[in-house]
Amino acid sequence: MADRNLRDLLAPLGIDAPVRELREMTLDSRKSSAGDLFVAIKGHQTDGRHYIPQAIAQGVAAVIAEAQGEVDNGTVQIMHGVPVVYVNDLNNKLSQLAGEFYCHPGDKLHLIGVTGTNGKTTTTQLLAQWSHGLGETSAVMGTVGNGLLGRVAPSENTTGSAVDIQLDLQQLVRQEATFAAMEVSSHGLVQGRVAALPFEAAVFTNLSRDHLDYHGDMEHYEAAKWLLFSTHNVKQQIINADDEIGLKWLSRLPQAVAVTMENRLPENWQGRWLAAREIKYHDKGVSITFESSWGGGTIDSSLMGAFNVSNLLLALSTLLALDYPLEKLLETASCLEPVCGRMEVFTTPGKPVVVVDYAHTPDALEKALMAARLHCQGKLWCVFGCGGDRDKGKRPLMGGVAEQLADYVIVTDDNPRNEEPQAIIADILTGFLDPGRAIAIHGRVEAVTNAIMQAKADDVVLIAGKGHEDYQLVGHRRLDYSDRLTVARLLGVIA
């Protein structure tokens, strides 16, 4: 739809809209300008229809709004000369409309969707790095940002709006991207933001407690993740069989690829598979020997921990399922690098090994600590906090995990937002059998400094919770802060 005309855009929905040339599509009235199409949806927190007058005042050419109440589907109202077209179930139609508006960019590259509680960022980055090594022009979309490898622009959400996703994909196509690995969040699935995307492969990493403030319970959270497989006609489905939910899903997905590092293939499994046979952890990373439906081999990687072995095997299985040659994948595996802020290691002679990780759920913290322990000769330190205005139930669980798996624990502020930091730390400490084992230090810089200065050279210090983030949310303020830069400064290295 090169001319971006309102009539042509809405015709497939059976709506007779007036002819209007359109420049860009936007959900934010504050960012709308002359010639744009403003889309007014009823969101989780705000109703975009309240901002139609503001968008019209800023010169938009047309408005599409959610139909509700007395206003019927297809109704066209003229407000100050601007057509406002009402559409039923607009949220669920928006991905398709945005795809049409931006000429369906997802059709022009290999698009991979990765969902799960943990491991999405690392798995997408590994997919992009690995495919790039095989000649693709690769991109990532997710928590760290969107863009070609090495040129990623920060993003506000793991999965952007339906409009932003299609626009970002169009920009990637214009930059000649041929491969894109996208993190697909549960929020994004429930809200239909990826509904019209033509994923060639869908990957499931794992499921553990997170986002219950939004989904309510684990059953609804699981159902949200399942949408990637139940509502998309994805040819290649790659499932972590070591996860209980993944194992259950495999019974519904006989054509999927089952991936295991714990020899947990489903009983009498007839489908494709990949399994680790031997895993050796060492101070430089890990060596993995595997077998699969495509053959076997050994991969040497600088990644840390068991869960990164799982991420690596999921990425490998995905690329094999997409017909990338095993021989070439093995040749390029050693070039894979750890992801920024994901079990990222900082070292300098005479100082402890410091690991910065994004772990902010009980399961992720457990896996990060277990990963760090595999590479630890001395004592294991853990510095972490929990975000304010988010799931309070996970706070004591994370406290219990830290007490059980670390030798020393420092509890500090994460992103307190509008909660009292003291109250958040108090919630965390209720999970300790012996709260006296934890040291509470509110200032995050002070907490990180304290751990690194006290730890010995053969110790490992895990700084968990913020990973790649370069800010801290305190009240309504967004402060400049980075665990990575703080650690690098203390160790005298470059982040």
From Swiss-Prot:
Source organism phylogeny: Bacteria, Pseudomonadati, Pseudomonadota, Gammaproteobacteria, Enterobacterales
Q: Record-annotated residues binding ATP?
A: G116, T117, N118, G119, K120, T121, T122
Could you cite one Gene Ontology molecular function of this protein?
A: magnesium ion binding
PTMs per UniProt: Carboxylation is probably crucial for Mg(2+) binding and, consequently, for the gamma-phosphate positioning of ATP.
In Swiss-Prot or TrEMBL terms, this protein is called: UDP-N-acetylmuramoyl-L-alanyl-D-glutamate--2,6-diaminopimelate ligase
Which EC number(s) are documented for this chain?
6.3.2.13
In this chain, meso-2,6-diaminopimelate is annotated as bound at: R390, D414, N415, P416, R417, G465, E469
The record, for Gene3D superfamilies, names: Mur ligase, C-terminal domain (3.90.190.20), Mur-like, catalytic domain (3.40.1190.10), MurE/MurF, N-terminal domain (3.40.1390.10)
Any Gene Ontology CC annotation: cytoplasm
Organism (species): Photorhabdus laumondii subsp. laumondii (strain DSM 15139 / CIP 105565 / TT01)
HAMAP family referenced in this protein's UniProt entry, alphabetically? MurE
Where does this protein chiefly localize? cytoplasm
Q: Which gene encodes it?
A: murE
What does the protein in this record do? Catalyzes the addition of meso-diaminopimelic acid to the nucleotide precursor UDP-N-acetylmuramoyl-L-alanyl-D-glutamate (UMAG) in the biosynthesis of bacterial cell-wall peptidoglycan.
Binding of UDP-N-acetyl-alpha-D-muramoyl-L-alanyl-D-glutamate occurs at L27, S29, H44, Q45, T46, N157, T158, T159, S185, Q191, R193
- Of which family is this protein a member? Belongs to the MurCDEF family. MurE subfamily.
Keywords, comma-separated and alphabetical: ATP-binding, Cell cycle, Cell division, Cell shape, Cell wall biogenesis/degradation, Cytoplasm, Ligase, Magnesium, Nucleotide-binding, Peptidoglycan synthesis
Q: Give the superkingdom in one word.
A: Bacteria
**Which cofactor does this sequence's record say it needs?**
Mg(2+)
Q: In which compartments does the protein localize?
A: Cytoplasm
Q: Which GO terms describe its biological process?
A: cell division; cell wall organization; peptidoglycan biosynthetic process; regulation of cell shape
Reaction catalysis annotation = UDP-N-acetyl-alpha-D-muramoyl-L-alanyl-D-glutamate + meso-2,6-diaminopimelate + ATP = UDP-N-acetyl-alpha-D-muramoyl-L-alanyl-gamma-D-glutamyl-meso-2,6-diaminopimelate + ADP + phosphate + H(+)
